[in-house]
């Protein structure tokens, strides 16, 4: 059986209709013409198509755009996304004039939940562990380590706390011996803390190196040391990193990347054949062997006044057009891994494509010819189909193997324009 590929908008259109308790009007209640092809008609007309196989194919197509092999397993408890990721999503969802520095943003949490910070010779050491996995076909634009610093000071005596922060990558020896491990400096900087707040450190180069080595665990060690000698620093205050387990201030590695594998969808131009629709001599005997009497009457009726016919047909309200279709992720059982939005307006294309095809429906040459053949012999070819011709992206925040991921442009999710194909 040949592969059957449908756009994502069609996937959600079908899923929404199949979902239990769906408020969407059933096909039998449709005010459209009875001969308008919907999914049920399409399936029965194509021999050898198994419905369950089709659903699996559509699900695979949806997940492929997210670089997922399958729907992430549902955990017993819902994962609380980092506040930073929620802020990113809300920022770009509400402000359409702004856009992130990359299309894909992943957040990796600290995996070392048991090690405690230690102090030695005036240096406070914090161990961190990140399990980083970034597909090779993506380009890492930027990576930053976000640490929440806790400042404790006497506000009456001191303005702030002056500290030096060094971020090391712990490199294990070939035999795994801790005695032979080395420390690579990733960041060395000075900060002057006056209030508890987030501090951001650029570790882009290290993250690009990690990407090349494939999915693996990487150990970091944060050193905080005073810029004063120990005697002068006594009583001035403290600056620490918030390492509390299950805390909204968990250390966070945020990676910004772009997908380099997909080609941008090209806009289909209006075919010049539209301008020649009225010039076709439909009454010649050379056209498909000559029309029968019923088809001839229909063609003559269409050609009497093309403009008036278009207006009259459009006034009926059943011509091809975009109509509302709201997708609720909870209703289709995907709210366990799609964090935001809870749903969105996907729209759908409904209506009929009668000859002559209106210019605003941007028909292809194939659609125009198919409409002509249907007009001549409805048993030989069906009408052209009312389908999405332009799709818009949406932004989505979701879980990918436990990693909270934000995708700014998740292409092909909402219908922008409809046409005849």
From Swiss-Prot:
CDD domains registered for this protein in UniProt: TGF_beta_BMP10
Main location: secreted
Positions annotated as propeptide: 22-313
Classification via PROSITE patterns: TGF_BETA_1, TGF_BETA_2
Keywords: Cell adhesion, Cleavage on pair of basic residues, Cytokine, Developmental protein, Disulfide bond, Glycoprotein, Growth factor, Secreted, Signal
Highest rank taxon of the organism: Eukaryota
Subcellular location: Secreted
Pfam families in the cross-refs: TGF_beta (PF00019), TGFb_propeptide (PF00688)
A single GO cellular-component term on record: cytoplasm
S-S pairs: 320-386, 349-418, 353-420
Alphabetical list of InterPro entries matching this protein: Cystine-knot_cytokine, TGF-b_C, TGF-b_propeptide, TGF-beta-rel, TGFb_CS
Residue positions the entry lists as glycosylated: 67, 131
BP GO annotations: activin receptor signaling pathway; adult heart development; atrial cardiac muscle tissue morphogenesis; BMP signaling pathway; cardiac muscle cell proliferation; cell adhesion; heart development; heart trabecula formation
GO molecular function, one term: hormone activity
Signal peptide: 1-21
SMART domains linked to this entry: TGFB
Family the entry assigns: Belongs to the TGF-beta family.
Job description of the protein: Required for maintaining the proliferative activity of embryonic cardiomyocytes by preventing premature activation of the negative cell cycle regulator CDKN1C/p57KIP and maintaining the required expression levels of cardiogenic factors such as MEF2C and NKX2-5. Acts as a ligand for ACVRL1/ALK1, BMPR1A/ALK3 and BMPR1B/ALK6, leading to activation of SMAD1, SMAD5 and SMAD8 transcription factors. Inhibits endothelial cell migration and growth. May reduce cell migration and cell matrix adhesion in breast cancer cell lines.
Miscellaneous notes: Does not appear to contribute to radiation susceptibility in the LEC strain.
Complex formation: Homodimer; disulfide-linked. Interacts with FBN1 (via N-terminal domain) and FBN2. Interacts with ENG.
Name listed for the protein in its UniProt record: Bone morphogenetic protein 10
């Amino acid at each position: 059986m040949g592969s059957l590929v449908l756009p994502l908008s069609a996937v959600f259109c079908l899923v929404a209709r199949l979902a239990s308790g769906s408020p969407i009007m059933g096909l039998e209640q449709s005010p459209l013409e009875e001969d308008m092809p919907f999914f049920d008609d399409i399936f029965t007309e194509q021999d050898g198509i198994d419905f369950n196989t089709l659903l699996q194919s559509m699900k695979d197509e949806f997940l492929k755009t997210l670089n997922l092999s399958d729907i992430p397993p549902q955990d017993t408890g819902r994962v609380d996304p980092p506040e930073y990721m929620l802020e990113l999503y809300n920022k770009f969802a509400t402000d359409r004039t702004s856009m992130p520095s990359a299309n894909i943003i992943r957040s990796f949490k600290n995996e070392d939940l048991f090690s405690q910070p230690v102090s030695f010779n005036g240096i406070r050491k914090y161990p961190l562990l990140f399990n980083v996995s970034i597909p090779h076909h993506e380009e890492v634009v930027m990576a930053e380590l976000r640490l929440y610093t806790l400042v404790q000071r006497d506000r009456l005596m001191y303005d702030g706390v002056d500290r030096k922060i060094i971020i090391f990558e712990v490199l294990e020896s070939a035999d795994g011996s801790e005695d032979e491990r080395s420390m690579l400096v990733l960041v060395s900087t000075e900060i002057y803390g006056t209030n508890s707040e987030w501090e951001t450190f650029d570790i882009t180069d290290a993250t690009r190196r990690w990407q090349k080595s494939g999915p693996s665990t990487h150990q970091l060690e944060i050193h905080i040391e005073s810029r004063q000698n120990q005697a002068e620093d006594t009583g001035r205050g403290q600056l620490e990193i918030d390492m509390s387990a299950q805390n909204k201030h968990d250390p966070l590695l945020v990676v910004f990347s772009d997908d380099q594998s997909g080609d941008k969808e090209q806009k289909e131009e209006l075919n010049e054949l539209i301008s020649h629709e009225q010039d076709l001599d439909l009454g010649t005997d050379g056209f498909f062997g000559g029309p029968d009497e019923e088809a001839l009457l229909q063609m003559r009726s269409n050609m009497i006044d093309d403009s008036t016919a278009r207006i009259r047909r459009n006034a009926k309200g059943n011509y091809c057009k975009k109509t509302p279709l709201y997708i609720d992720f909870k209703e289709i059982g995907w709210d366990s891994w799609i964090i935001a939005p809870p749903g969105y307006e996907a729209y759908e294309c409904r209506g009929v494509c009668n000859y002559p095809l209106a210019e605003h429906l941007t028909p292809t040459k194939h659609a125009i010819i198919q409409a002509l053949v249907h007009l001549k012999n409805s048993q030989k070819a069906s009408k052209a189909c009312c389908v999405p011709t332009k799709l818009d992206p949406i932004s989505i925040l979701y879980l990918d193997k436990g990693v909270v991921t934000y995708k700014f442009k998740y292409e092909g999710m909402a219908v922008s324009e409809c046409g005849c194909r």
